[in-house]
Amino acid sequence: MSMFNKVVKEFQWGQHKVRLETGEVARQASGAVIVDVEDTVVLATVVGAKSAKPGQDFFPLTVDYLEKTYSAGKIPGGFFRREGRPSEHETLTSRLIDRPLRPLFPEGFYNEVQVVIHVLSVNPEIPADIPALIGASAALAVSGLPFNGPVGAARVAYIDNAYVLNPTRDQLKASSLDLVVAGTERAVLMVESEADQLSEEVMLGAVVFGHEQMQIAIDAIHELVRDGGKPEWDWQPAAKNEALIARVTELAQNDLLAAYQLRDKQARSAKLKEVYAATSAKLEEDALAAGTVAADKATVGNVLFDIEAKIVRSQILNGEPRIDGRDTRTVRPIEIRTGVLPRTHGSALFTRGETQALVVATLGTKGDEQIIDALEGEYRERFMLHYNMPPFATGETGRVGSPKRREIGHGRLAKRALVKCLPSADEFGYSIRVVSEITESNGSSSMASVCGGCLALMDAGVPMKAHVAGIAMGLILEGNKFAVLTDILGDEDHLGDMDFKVAGTEQGVTALQMDIKIQGITKEIMQVALAQAKEGRLHILGKMTSAVSGANTQLSEFAPRMITVKINPEKIRDVIGKGGSVIRALTEETGTTIDISDDGVVTIASTSSEGMAEAKKRIEQITAEIEVGQVYEGTVLKLLDFGAIVNLLPGKDGLLHISEIVNERVKDINDYLKEGQQVKVKVIQTDEKGRVRLSAKALLNEAAAAAQSDTPPQQ
């Protein structure tokens, strides 16, 4: 009899066979599930604390997705030969898993929960993110934790005008869409996508298709729970302190209403801080007078937050102006300036209301491309986009340093929005880095990065296929009433039910990201949000086109210029030289950057046209073939008893035999030649070993013969 109570569920999911199993591995975790999709295997585990920490006033959920190099049959690089800090891909996948899980935990559940997913085996054709998300959902479901799941997930491609479920990596290369959708049986919770200017109808269709197809996985998780799940936790939310709620409402409601009549963010924030402080102080006075203990500030803060949310949400649903005085469809005022930094390759300052991005584009060579060492194999990234948001952007102090998960996620979203509108490497051979520095933030800074990024690229002379703009939408949902908000503020994001970001061109959508803070939304709400987002996006595109009609035709004087030279691939080693000596000398002496591809295409880059021309000339000389009958102006390198070694081209020498110097007999070669002397010679013979024989007297004889016949001598 086995010591394991192993439960296995298998199902066919599109073109893939999926296997879920629990009960054998990681049995001391609250829940653990292994997911196997065509040899891509992940172990998802969940551990939940049995009680919340004292004074805990938020839900401490952490999700860690970890790729093990052994899963791809590799040994890690580096001195220690073990996995280090999470890669950008691991961080993004951790966020992808966190986003649909978080809203399904009940309000008031503050116990610490940790979800850890290990990638144990990788089929290069099957991405591990969807199995990881399914595994995390299943592990939570079997754990018995209070979780309103399970969650399903699916990747959707769009190939030849048809949706494809969970495509392979090869299929994704031919797809105009890469969309991940997650949700419950009833509704969609999360969308993350990159598209090639697709219509809103196609995007919505992909979301609906993915939601329909994920039901198979949700059903399988239900079966796994039925046969292998642990007992449900007996957890109940703490009873609400109605007396405290009533007293806080009495003390603060009117002041909070007044605060939300202030249109300026800084003034409103200052007023809210006053209200919070005054309310806490008054409650402490009440407690002192009654001889009781006052409620802690975290509890009071939660009550005040709930009152704020009710005020803002009811005003919007009742048709009243939003926090800053706008209606639900108006975009904040926009200001655009390009070329703001004198020595950068391209720059733009994009301001929308109280959100501002200073975006800089830098052009580089192939050597500047980012090398990604992924489980599926090494590849190069030609386009990089980095997003930074320092604390001063919101008028606060805080840590400055390496990017946080949020910054990495926002940078990836902006990159996805722009990448499909970049020219190909054949059209524009530069590597490109865009950096978005958020200098002010009051909502939708990632979409400001998209707009500013597009403008900075055009300022740098990158021939974009079209202008790209982004906009963030919000949602207020109460029962059957809902309002979709265009261009949300930070407070509206904080107090609302959805963050729905859409980027694209006039032609269509290039990126769509949706996060739901409630337990899902319907197709109708998504339809309204997409239509309203298109209206806002077109408005912003109009402003951008008015400011910058197209890409600059001239690159910045500080940007590198590039030329290419095609050489025989067999000559690559000659250009590189022993230990890189030749190419190193070339780059140092000409002030250029030189990249050589395996097919013999040499790319020379420099801010100096003279340096590029010199490097090109020298490369052509190095790779030139020595041909019999050719005449060269050579340099005497060395004198020997029987002749001289003459350098014809870089790395190409020949022997000028003593008998080939002049027609008369030469007794002492020093009477005719000196080391370093320039001498004109003709190639009279080459052999299979590359040895070259030269003659100077042949040219003398030709000149004499030409003089006799009045024919100009050969030059």
UniProtKB/Swiss-Prot annotation:
This is Polyribonucleotide nucleotidyltransferase. InterPro entries: ExoRNase_PH_dom1 (IPR001247), ExoRNase_PH_dom2 (IPR015847), ExoRNase_PH_dom2_sf (IPR036345), KH_dom (IPR004087), KH_dom_type_1 (IPR004088), KH_dom_type_1_sf (IPR036612), NA-bd_OB-fold (IPR012340), PNPase (IPR012162). Its cofactor is Mg(2+). It comes from Burkholderia orbicola (strain MC0-3). GO terms for cellular component: cytosol. The keyword Electron transport does not apply. Residues 629-697 form the S1 motif domain. Residues 560-619 form the KH domain. Its EC number is 2.7.7.8. The gene is pnp. Belongs to the polyribonucleotide nucleotidyltransferase family. GO terms for biological process: mRNA catabolic process; RNA processing. It is found in: Cytoplasm. Involved in mRNA degradation. Catalyzes the phosphorolysis of single-stranded polyribonucleotides processively in the 3'- to 5'-direction. It catalyses: RNA(n+1) + phosphate = RNA(n) + a ribonucleoside 5'-diphosphate. SUPFAM superfamilies: Eukaryotic type KH-domain (KH-domain type I), Nucleic acid-binding proteins, Ribonuclease PH domain 2-like, Ribosomal protein S5 domain 2-like. One of its GO terms (molecular function) is magnesium ion binding. SMART domains: KH, S1. Keywords: Cytoplasm, Magnesium, Metal-binding, Nucleotidyltransferase, RNA-binding, Transferase. Mg(2+) binds at residues 493, 499.
